[in-house]
Amino acid sequence: RGIGAATVLEFARAGYDVAFTWNSREDAALDVVQQAQALNPGGRFVALHADVSDSAQVNAAVQETLQQFGSLQALMCCAGIAQQKLFTDLTDEDWHRMMGVDLDGVFYACRAVLPGMIRQKYGRILLVSSMWGQTGGSCEVHYSAAKAGVIGLTKALAKEEGPSGITVNCVAPGVIETDMMASFTAEDKAALAEETPVERLGTPEEVARTLVFLAGRGAGFITGQVLGVNGGIVI
Protein backbone atom coordinates (compact mmCIF):
# COMPACT_ATOMS: atom_id res chain seq x y z
CA ARG A 1 0.00 0.00 0.00
CA GLY A 2 0.99 3.65 -0.17
CA ILE A 3 4.60 4.39 -1.08
CA GLY A 4 5.44 0.71 -1.46
CA ALA A 5 2.71 -0.03 -3.98
CA ALA A 6 3.39 3.17 -5.89
CA THR A 7 7.08 2.30 -6.08
CA VAL A 8 6.43 -1.18 -7.48
CA LEU A 9 4.29 0.38 -10.20
CA GLU A 10 6.81 3.11 -11.03
CA PHE A 11 9.61 0.54 -11.32
CA ALA A 12 7.34 -1.56 -13.55
CA ARG A 13 6.66 1.48 -15.72
CA ALA A 14 10.43 2.04 -15.99
CA GLY A 15 10.94 -1.51 -17.29
CA TYR A 16 12.21 -3.29 -14.17
CA ASP A 17 11.33 -6.79 -12.98
CA VAL A 18 10.20 -6.47 -9.35
CA ALA A 19 9.88 -8.75 -6.34
CA PHE A 20 8.28 -7.19 -3.28
CA THR A 21 7.11 -8.31 0.14
CA TRP A 22 3.74 -8.09 1.78
CA ASN A 23 2.75 -8.91 5.35
CA SER A 24 -0.96 -8.55 6.06
CA ARG A 25 -2.93 -8.30 2.80
CA GLU A 26 -2.28 -10.83 0.07
CA ASP A 27 -5.24 -9.55 -1.97
CA ALA A 28 -3.73 -6.07 -2.14
CA ALA A 29 -0.33 -7.50 -3.09
CA LEU A 30 -1.80 -9.58 -5.92
CA ASP A 31 -3.68 -6.52 -7.16
CA VAL A 32 -0.37 -4.64 -7.34
CA VAL A 33 1.12 -7.53 -9.34
CA GLN A 34 -1.75 -7.30 -11.83
CA GLN A 35 -1.36 -3.54 -12.17
CA ALA A 36 2.41 -3.88 -12.67
CA GLN A 37 1.91 -6.57 -15.31
CA ALA A 38 -0.48 -4.28 -17.17
CA LEU A 39 2.12 -1.50 -17.16
CA ASN A 40 4.95 -3.80 -18.27
CA PRO A 41 3.52 -6.91 -19.97
CA GLY A 42 6.96 -8.41 -20.55
CA GLY A 43 8.10 -7.91 -16.98
CA ARG A 44 8.19 -10.34 -14.07
CA PHE A 45 6.50 -9.40 -10.81
CA VAL A 46 6.51 -11.49 -7.65
CA ALA A 47 4.77 -10.86 -4.33
CA LEU A 48 6.46 -12.62 -1.39
CA HIS A 49 5.07 -12.91 2.11
CA ALA A 50 7.45 -11.69 4.82
CA ASP A 51 7.43 -9.93 8.17
CA VAL A 52 10.48 -7.71 7.78
CA SER A 53 11.10 -7.70 11.53
CA ASP A 54 12.01 -11.41 11.23
CA SER A 55 15.48 -11.89 9.75
CA ALA A 56 14.76 -15.46 8.64
CA GLN A 57 11.74 -14.32 6.62
CA VAL A 58 13.73 -11.50 5.03
CA ASN A 59 16.55 -13.89 4.12
CA ALA A 60 14.04 -16.31 2.59
CA ALA A 61 12.44 -13.55 0.52
CA VAL A 62 15.81 -12.43 -0.82
CA GLN A 63 16.83 -16.01 -1.68
CA GLU A 64 13.52 -16.59 -3.49
CA THR A 65 14.07 -13.38 -5.46
CA LEU A 66 17.57 -14.49 -6.47
CA GLN A 67 16.29 -17.92 -7.49
CA GLN A 68 13.63 -16.38 -9.71
CA PHE A 69 15.57 -13.43 -11.14
CA GLY A 70 19.17 -14.61 -10.98
CA SER A 71 20.55 -11.34 -9.64
CA LEU A 72 19.41 -8.26 -7.80
CA GLN A 73 20.29 -4.79 -9.05
CA ALA A 74 18.46 -2.64 -6.51
CA LEU A 75 16.96 -2.93 -3.04
CA MET A 76 14.29 -0.56 -1.81
CA CYS A 77 13.16 -0.65 1.84
CA CYS A 78 9.97 1.18 2.75
CA ALA A 79 8.02 -1.17 5.02
CA GLY A 80 7.00 0.85 8.03
CA ILE A 81 4.59 1.39 10.86
CA ALA A 82 3.75 4.56 12.78
CA GLN A 83 2.24 5.26 16.17
CA GLN A 84 1.39 8.45 18.05
CA LYS A 85 1.90 8.12 21.77
CA LEU A 86 3.41 10.11 24.62
CA PHE A 87 6.97 9.01 25.30
CA THR A 88 6.17 8.22 28.94
CA ASP A 89 3.33 5.93 27.83
CA LEU A 90 5.48 3.84 25.47
CA THR A 91 5.78 0.19 26.42
CA ASP A 92 8.71 -2.09 25.71
CA GLU A 93 6.52 -3.78 23.11
CA ASP A 94 5.77 -0.44 21.39
CA TRP A 95 9.47 0.37 21.20
CA HIS A 96 10.65 -3.04 20.01
CA ARG A 97 7.88 -3.39 17.42
CA MET A 98 8.70 0.03 15.96
CA MET A 99 12.42 -0.69 15.80
CA GLY A 100 11.77 -4.19 14.47
CA VAL A 101 9.84 -3.02 11.43
CA ASP A 102 11.25 0.44 10.74
CA LEU A 103 14.95 -0.14 11.46
CA ASP A 104 15.79 -3.81 12.03
CA GLY A 105 14.01 -4.75 8.80
CA VAL A 106 16.24 -2.36 6.87
CA PHE A 107 19.35 -3.91 8.44
CA TYR A 108 18.17 -7.44 7.66
CA ALA A 109 17.39 -6.62 4.03
CA CYS A 110 20.66 -4.78 3.38
CA ARG A 111 22.66 -7.58 4.98
CA ALA A 112 20.86 -10.19 2.87
CA VAL A 113 21.40 -8.52 -0.51
CA LEU A 114 24.92 -7.18 -0.08
CA PRO A 115 26.93 -10.38 -0.73
CA GLY A 116 25.46 -10.65 -4.23
CA MET A 117 25.87 -6.95 -4.95
CA ILE A 118 29.49 -7.05 -3.79
CA ARG A 119 30.21 -10.03 -6.06
CA GLN A 120 28.72 -8.31 -9.09
CA LYS A 121 30.36 -4.97 -8.17
CA TYR A 122 27.09 -3.13 -8.63
CA GLY A 123 24.03 -2.26 -6.61
CA ARG A 124 21.60 0.44 -5.63
CA ILE A 125 20.27 0.49 -2.08
CA LEU A 126 17.33 2.84 -1.55
CA LEU A 127 16.00 3.45 1.94
CA VAL A 128 12.98 5.41 3.13
CA SER A 129 13.24 7.52 6.26
CA SER A 130 10.97 10.46 7.14
CA MET A 131 11.18 14.15 7.84
CA TRP A 132 10.73 13.13 11.49
CA GLY A 133 14.00 11.24 11.22
CA GLN A 134 15.58 14.61 10.43
CA THR A 135 13.74 16.89 12.85
CA GLY A 136 12.09 14.63 15.45
CA GLY A 137 8.36 14.47 16.04
CA SER A 138 6.56 15.08 19.33
CA CYS A 139 4.53 12.04 20.42
CA GLU A 140 6.41 9.99 17.80
CA VAL A 141 9.74 9.62 19.57
CA HIS A 142 10.19 5.92 18.80
CA TYR A 143 9.22 6.45 15.15
CA SER A 144 11.58 9.42 14.89
CA ALA A 145 14.41 7.44 16.48
CA ALA A 146 13.94 4.53 14.08
CA LYS A 147 13.86 6.82 11.04
CA ALA A 148 16.93 8.71 12.27
CA GLY A 149 18.62 5.32 12.50
CA VAL A 150 17.83 4.72 8.83
CA ILE A 151 19.60 7.98 7.98
CA GLY A 152 22.66 6.98 10.00
CA LEU A 153 22.70 3.56 8.35
CA THR A 154 22.50 5.20 4.92
CA LYS A 155 25.52 7.41 5.48
CA ALA A 156 27.72 4.76 7.09
CA LEU A 157 26.85 1.99 4.63
CA ALA A 158 27.47 4.31 1.67
CA LYS A 159 31.04 4.83 2.87
CA GLU A 160 31.61 1.11 3.41
CA GLU A 161 30.15 -0.13 0.13
CA GLY A 162 31.16 2.64 -2.27
CA PRO A 163 34.38 0.85 -3.29
CA SER A 164 32.25 -2.14 -4.33
CA GLY A 165 30.25 -0.10 -6.84
CA ILE A 166 27.22 0.11 -4.54
CA THR A 167 25.41 3.35 -3.79
CA VAL A 168 23.21 3.83 -0.73
CA ASN A 169 20.73 6.68 -0.56
CA CYS A 170 17.74 7.64 1.50
CA VAL A 171 14.51 9.47 0.75
CA ALA A 172 12.91 11.40 3.61
CA PRO A 173 9.27 12.05 2.71
CA GLY A 174 7.31 14.92 4.18
CA VAL A 175 3.56 14.72 4.64
CA ILE A 176 2.35 12.18 2.08
CA GLU A 177 -1.25 11.10 1.48
CA THR A 178 -1.11 7.45 2.59
CA ASP A 179 -3.00 5.12 4.94
CA MET A 180 -0.78 6.39 7.77
CA MET A 181 -2.77 9.63 7.59
CA ALA A 182 -6.14 7.93 8.00
CA SER A 183 -6.55 9.34 11.52
CA PHE A 184 -5.98 12.95 10.37
CA THR A 185 -9.04 15.14 9.86
CA ALA A 186 -9.53 17.36 6.84
CA GLU A 187 -8.67 20.30 9.08
CA ASP A 188 -5.43 18.61 10.17
CA LYS A 189 -4.45 18.01 6.55
CA ALA A 190 -5.29 21.58 5.57
CA ALA A 191 -3.10 22.88 8.39
CA LEU A 192 -0.20 20.68 7.27
CA ALA A 193 -0.62 21.83 3.68
CA GLU A 194 -0.53 25.43 4.87
CA GLU A 195 2.79 24.77 6.64
CA THR A 196 4.26 23.37 3.41
CA PRO A 197 5.74 25.98 1.04
CA VAL A 198 4.15 24.37 -2.04
CA GLU A 199 0.81 24.49 -0.16
CA ARG A 200 -0.24 20.88 -0.62
CA LEU A 201 0.52 17.38 0.59
CA GLY A 202 2.67 14.96 -1.37
CA THR A 203 1.65 11.80 -3.19
CA PRO A 204 3.15 8.31 -3.01
CA GLU A 205 3.91 8.55 -6.73
CA GLU A 206 6.18 11.56 -6.18
CA VAL A 207 8.23 9.59 -3.67
CA ALA A 208 8.28 6.56 -5.97
CA ARG A 209 9.56 8.53 -8.96
CA THR A 210 12.43 9.84 -6.82
CA LEU A 211 13.36 6.28 -5.87
CA VAL A 212 13.32 5.18 -9.51
CA PHE A 213 15.71 8.02 -10.36
CA LEU A 214 18.10 7.01 -7.56
CA ALA A 215 18.04 3.41 -8.82
CA GLY A 216 19.15 4.39 -12.30
CA ARG A 217 22.65 4.42 -13.73
CA GLY A 218 22.41 8.19 -14.06
CA ALA A 219 22.52 8.45 -10.26
CA GLY A 220 25.84 6.64 -9.95
CA PHE A 221 27.65 9.64 -8.43
CA ILE A 222 25.01 10.13 -5.73
CA THR A 223 25.54 8.18 -2.52
CA GLY A 224 25.13 8.66 1.21
CA GLN A 225 22.52 11.34 0.61
CA VAL A 226 19.17 12.08 2.25
CA LEU A 227 16.77 13.54 -0.30
CA GLY A 228 13.75 15.29 1.15
CA VAL A 229 10.58 14.79 -0.87
CA ASN A 230 8.64 17.17 1.32
CA GLY A 231 7.39 20.23 -0.55
CA GLY A 232 9.84 22.38 1.40
CA ILE A 233 8.40 21.72 4.86
CA VAL A 234 11.96 20.79 5.95
CA ILE A 235 14.68 22.98 4.46
Which stretches of residues belong to each language-model region?
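Canonical Rossmann dinucleotide-binding motif of NAD(H)/NADP(H)-dependent dehydrogenases/reductases
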Residues: 1-19
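Conserved glycine-rich Rossmann-like NAD(P)H-binding loop of the short-chain dehydrogenase/reductase
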Residues: 16-31
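Catalytic Tyr-X3-Lys loop
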Residues: 73, 81, 88-108, 122, ...
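Substrate-binding pocket helix/loop in short-chain dehydrogenase/reductase
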Residues: 86-87, 94-96, 181, 188, ...
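Alpha-helical segment proximal to the catalytic Tyr-Lys
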Residues: 115, 159-160, 220
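Residue(s) in the substrate-gating loop at a strand-loop-helix junction
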Residues: 130
